[in-house]
Amino acid sequence: MNNSGFAFDPDVFLSHVSTLSGVYQMRDQNGTVLYVGKAKNLRQRLSHYFQKTGLSVKTRALMRAVYDIQTTSTPTEAEALLLENNLIKQYQPKFNILLRDDKSYPYICLSQHDFPRLFLYRGARKNGDFFGPYPNVQSAHHALAILQKVFRLRPCLDSFFKNRSRPCLQYQIKRCYAPCVGKISAEMYAQTVQHARDFLTGNSEHLLQTLTEHMLQASAAQQYERAAIVRDQISELRTIQQKQSMVVYAANVDVLAVATAYGKACVQVLFFRDGHSVTSQAFFPKLPELLPAGAILQAFIGQFYHQRPVPSQIVLSEALPDMDAVSEFLSQMSAHTVTLTTQPRAIRKKWLRMTQENARLNLRLHLAQKLSMHERFKALAQAFDWQKMPQRLECVDISHMQGEYTVASCVVFDRRGAVKSDYRRYKINGITGGDDYAAMKQVIKRRFARLKKGEGVMPDVFFVDGGRGQLQQAIAVFEEMQIEGVQLIGVAKGEGRKAGLEQFWFPHENRPRTLPADSQAMQLIIHIRDEAHRFAISAHRRGRDKKVRVSLLEEIPNIGRKRRQALLQHFGNLAGLMQASPEDITRVPGISVKLAAQIYAALHQGE
């Protein structure tokens, strides 16, 4: 399997991927998640995708679209399964089988009732308190059986509960307190429910301390049977605590860990929202100087949460220089108390270890890829017999739709990789629709006019996406503007437009040059060319969609500029407006019932 359009070197990538269990996300050039998978051994599983033979048609189609792969390791395969399920629900990847809904994993539920029911539940969560999800129904049944043995909360349906005149078998085998016939007071039952809720929400240590006190009090009062019951409760709860593998429902928590090496840093953030929506992301902040890990985290937090929701608790791998000040700052900014901790316990301690491991692994991979980019620059110089290795590469690409909405992009790479802060887009005006030569000439003139003024850095190599004709436009501009010291190269698609068969046109040469499809120089050029194409296409689509959106609304009578703006602002975009009912549309200021019906009819004409 060969896809030279990856954002990474597959061999380098695989050599640094963890051998732990975990989850991987495959993304396209736009960052869209194409596929989410789990693995008992990430390296072993991912190596399968890079085999030259034996891949299914679906897998080959997937790998042709893959641009980047992100991994997150987990302590257990069960947790990888849960994380995979959460990510599939979140991103709805088109290469995954999207049949799983909330019925995929079971929860333990406490119903809303004067005498709540404790039971296993699978489906969309509505009324009640839900705890989970559990990795499989067997583990959930096992936990539920122990909880019923410990807390003796009723498992029966409400209809069964309200029609009892005597205790059922569950009471006889000491699995229920029989609240249906008054064998326990409402106050005592509520206290037991709270004990169960405390344990399921992670407050198990406090609960165990309380039960230990009850056991000692019963023993001191010579209530040995009662003391033995509480002792057994404590023992069973300890068993659950040790074997528990569910994602515990808790307050919103972010876990941040930093890893540093060779003057670089990776900050890994693990997000927990209500203990259910779990995802992970790696960030690589630029360091102006060597800083302690705590200082890196503190600087990162200030920027990271500037426009993001702040959770109630943040677990950190390192103490910050100003812990109290940062906590106060976040609390004021979010209007709720924010706790920072570097010494988590129980499940959060495991989350922190997992995040630290991912930070280290991602930093190693990041450093390896940077080294790989340097090697590719070196290979490029060797392939074209240049005496000096280039420092800066640029590539320009033109995109349009049947001659309309023409835009150009220019992407920049140095030996560390993409320099996205220097990327530029250009809207092309004043040319005949579809005239790519004129578009290329215009964008190169605009690009180098600024560079000659000192607004940016001159590239060493300038790639033009196109063949000999496009290269001639660039040569003409360079001669007109007296640009020197920049190597021009035209990148033409090869036979059948297949990646790896590209031809390279140089000024004043009558024949194109070629490179081996698997060479590092070829991979680098294709990577840069594809990135320029992606950047141009994304801008082109936005411009086209905006024009289509506005023109569609402009065709509706009595909808002027202010009403168009109000509609799009209220629903976010045209897609949101298309999904709205006439009643929803009337909620927009200035839109009457009659006008809402008119808008709805115009948008759905022909359906």
Swiss-Prot record:
Its main location: cytoplasm. GO terms for biological process: nucleotide-excision repair; SOS response. Residues 19-97 form the GIY-YIG domain. Pfam families: GIY-YIG, HHH_5, UVR, UvrC_RNaseH, UvrC_RNaseH_dom. One of its GO terms (molecular function) is excinuclease ABC activity. It is found in: Cytoplasm. InterPro entries: GIY-YIG_endonuc (IPR000305), GIY-YIG_endonuc_sf (IPR035901), GIY-YIG_UvrC_Cho (IPR047296), Hlx-hairpin-Hlx_DNA-bd_motif (IPR003583), RuvA_2-like (IPR010994), UVR_dom (IPR001943), UVR_dom_sf (IPR036876), UvrABC_protein_C (IPR050066). GO terms for cellular component: cytoplasm; excinuclease repair complex. The keyword DNA repair applies. Keywords: Cytoplasm, DNA damage, DNA excision, DNA repair, Excision nuclease, SOS response. Residues 205-240 form the UVR domain. The UvrABC repair system catalyzes the recognition and processing of DNA lesions. UvrC both incises the 5' and 3' sides of the lesion. The N-terminal half is responsible for the 3' incision and the C-terminal half is responsible for the 5' incision. Belongs to the UvrC family. Interacts with UvrB in an incision complex. This is UvrABC system protein C. The gene is uvrC.
